[in-house]
Amino acid sequence: MSAEVIHQVEEALDTDEKEMLLFLCRDVAIDVVPPNVRDLLDILRERGKLSVGDLAELLYRVRRFDLLKRILKMDRKAVETHLLRNPHLVSDYRVLMAEIGEDLDKSDVSSLIFLMKDYMGRGKISKEKSFLDLVVELEKLNLVAPDQLDLLEKCLKNIHRIDLKTKIQKYKQSVQGAGTSYRNVLQAAIQKSLKDPSNNFRLHNGRSKEQRLKEQLGAQQEPVKKSIQESEAFLPQSIPEERYKMKSKPLGICLIIDCIGNETELLRDTFTSLGYEVQKFLHLSMHGISQILGQFACMPEHRDYDSFVCVLVSRGGSQSVYGVDQTHSGLPLHHIRRMFMGDSCPYLAGKPKMFFIQNYVVSEGQLEDSSLLEVDGPAMKNVEFKAQKRGLCTVHREADFFWSLCTADMSLLEQSHSSPSLYLQCLSQKLRQERKRPLLDLHIELNGYMYDWNSRVSAKEKYYVWLQHTLRKKLILSYT
């Protein structure tokens, strides 16, 4: 996306449209708060999150269909078709909030601000603020989130906007089946700490196992005070006792991409012993990683298997992997997850998709200039729409993910290039010795071990573990 196009869009939007666009993208550029639309779009462009389709989606969301036609040469119907067939840049939650804001008049917003004083405190937000400003403040106080809309629903009822209350209820029903919850901005902003592991980022697993388990299952209501790997940022409020089916032989494909070369044998032996068909690839570039992931995401063999595992070991940045390349940016981690969402990878819809990522973070001084790799999943398009038409994708597209990311300093490899990752060693040991226990429980104990390790070593030797999941059932990596 060129700077000229960004400039044209920014100039054409009015104040309200700019406010809406900034709000819609709060979950997309989570580690920065850009002051204006031009800076926001420029940041997204630099990070590879502003393809023509992405910009078309944003213009569609702010209802500037004239700009779609004049600047992007697309009509409304083409964008709607694109949104049906591709992962969305903007979450359904943000779209819902923006739509509610459009349907409220000034007196409605004033009434909502008044009602919220009981929860926010007086003077927290002025009467002149918009509904979207109010939502942002409520998010900061953890009073509103994608899976926490009861307060807003109650207040809409109190101002007699039953139509908007009903809209929220429909949204809840649409995501309830998936048991999924999204990050709100305040929770997700803690991810900035991953850019500098020494920047006040500590594992908080020194508490008792009972406390950690309560936090893991969402019993605590103050996610900002939790460690990232145990926050409610991407967790359902509870995990039902129902178990994922694990009966296929093999249980599924385990894809190992090791761009360092230290982990392959250990991981292969572990997942083979668990009943997975292991396929491994060594020393790939970031384009090679993207290509392999795209191929595996659309494999029809997934139809016959009950789960999927991907282990990725690479050098990278805080939110991307480089493979063997020397680059400033690389393949964004969120693009990897998008490749395997239910609407892009229909044969794995409703099945657990586990990702274990060891990322050795490289300082910027060691890198060459590059740009983020644009990943749009072309290899999946032909499978995707046909499968959706057959009704394979019946759960929320972001459901059933287990995403475990460990970052460590690149200097660990320089000290001992042949030494495996402590995180992956511990994970392998847990999986082999205690496979009949729930994966979440094993990961909590793994976090505790990493916390103990970090308390004894220097900053450069520490491992920082971050867990997100949207599991709807109990996950045990053993035949049921």
From Swiss-Prot:
Q: In which tissues is it expressed?
A: Widely expressed. Higher expression in skeletal muscle, pancreas, heart, kidney, placenta, and peripheral blood leukocytes. Also detected in diverse cell lines. Isoform 8 is predominantly expressed in testis and skeletal muscle.
Among Pfam families, the record links this protein to: DED (PF01335), Peptidase_C14 (PF00656)
Q: Where is this region: Interaction with CASP8?
A: 1-195, 370-480
Instruction: Indicate the segments forming the DED domain, all copies.
Output: 1-73, 92-170
Task: Name the keywords, alphabetized.
Answer: Apoptosis, Host-virus interaction, Repeat
Which GO CC terms are listed, alphabetically? CD95 death-inducing signaling complex; cytoplasm; cytosol; death-inducing signaling complex; ripoptosome
Return one GO MF term.
enzyme activator activity
Region: Interaction with CASP3; residue ranges are 192-435
Q: Where is this region: Caspase?
A: 263-358
Region annotation Interaction with TRAF1 and TRAF2: residue ranges? 192-480
Question: Is Repeat tagged as a keyword?
Answer: yes
Post-translation changes? Proteolytically processed by CASP8 generating subunit p43 and p12.
Resulting phenotype, residue 360 to F: Decreases apoptosis-inducing activity. Reduces interaction with caspase-3 and proteolytic processing
What PROSITE patterns does the record tag this protein with? CASPASE_P20, DED
Annotated region Interaction with CASP8 propeptide: the residues are 1-305
Q: GO annotations under biological process?
A: apoptotic process; cellular response to dexamethasone stimulus; cellular response to epidermal growth factor stimulus; cellular response to estradiol stimulus; cellular response to hypoxia; cellular response to insulin stimulus; cellular response to nitric oxide; extrinsic apoptotic signaling pathway via death domain receptors
Please indicate which residues carry the site annotation Cleavage. 369-370, 376-377
- Subunit text: TNFRSF6 stimulation triggers recruitment to the death-inducing signaling complex (DISC) formed by TNFRSF6, FADD and CASP8. A proteolytic fragment (p43) stays associated with the DISC. Also interacts with FADD, CASP8, CASP3, TRAF1, TRAF2 and Bcl-X(L) (in vitro). Interacts with RIPK1. (Microbial infection) Interacts with HBV protein X.
Domain writeup: The caspase domain lacks the active site residues involved in catalysis.
Q: What is this protein called?
A: CASP8 and FADD-like apoptosis regulator
> Which organism does this sequence originate in?
Homo sapiens (Human)
